[in-house]
UniProtKB/Swiss-Prot annotation:
Protease subunit of a proteasome-like degradation complex believed to be a general protein degrading machinery. It comes from Haemophilus ducreyi (strain 35000HP / ATCC 700724). Allosterically activated by HslU binding. The keyword Cell division does not apply. Its EC number is 3.4.25.2. The active site is at T2. This is ATP-dependent protease subunit HslV. GO terms for cellular component: HslUV protease complex; proteasome core complex. It holds the Pfam family Proteasome. Belongs to the peptidase T1B family. HslV subfamily. GO terms for molecular function: metal ion binding; threonine-type endopeptidase activity. InterPro entries: ATP-dep_Prtase_HsIV_su, Ntn_hydrolases_N, Proteasome_sua/b, Proteasome_suB-type. It is found in: Cytoplasm. It comes from the Bacteria.
Length: 173
């Protein structure tokens, strides 16, 4: 359970996430880093779901990026295919948002690789709260950057979602 949100605005893409890890109904850690840079710092990924599963998937995605020389869509599709067909990976419970400077995608274990129609994508238990906040901020006249919109969306989600906190990591490309 977490909040990961991605926003594209004015040629920049930002992904942010909270840092809370829960076990059942208890907070176990508040400083988990769920957003990371990959492939020569040109790709950002954020994950929601089981932490260990997400780390495995992030490592697999990084290998796909290296294999496909940083091609985001090809790497994401190859990861989704392997995730869905490999028996051991099928049981992994996590979702990822992956982004570079021009595109961003949702990747899931059911084989989904989705490019959103709007400039916002969010996952996790607080994802709908963050997505709503980010869309509202994108639709209003303001001078906020993609990174600032992500920060505000995470604050709102953290205020509402009990499985998200206010320890945020935000990366931008």
């Amino acid at each position: 359970m977490t909040t990961i949100v991605c926003v594209r605005k004015d040629g920049k893409v930002a992904i942010g996430g909270d840092g809370q890890a829960t076990l059942g109904n208890c907070v176990e850690k508040g400083t988990v880093r769920k957003v990371r840079r990959l492939y020569k710092d040109k790709v950002i990924t954020g994950f929601a779901g089981s932490t260990a599963d997400a780390f495995i998937l992030r490592d697999l995605f990084e290998k796909k990026l290296e294999l496909h020389q940083g091609h985001l869509v090809k790497s994401a599709v190859e990861l989704a295919k392997e995730w869905r067909t490999e028996r051991a990976l099928r049981k992994l419970e996590a979702m990822m948002i992956v982004a570079n400077e021009s595109e961003f995608l949702l990747v899931s274990g059911s084989g989904d690789v989705i490019e959103p129609e709007q400039d916002v994508l969010a996952i996790g238990s607080g994802g709908n709260f963050a997505k709503s906040a980010a869309l509202a901020l994108l639709r209003t006249e303001n001078n906020l950057t993609a990174k600032q919109i992500v920060a505000e969306a995470l604050k709102i989600a953290g205020d509402i979602d009990i499985y998200s906190n206010h320890n945020h990591v935000i990366e931008e490309v």
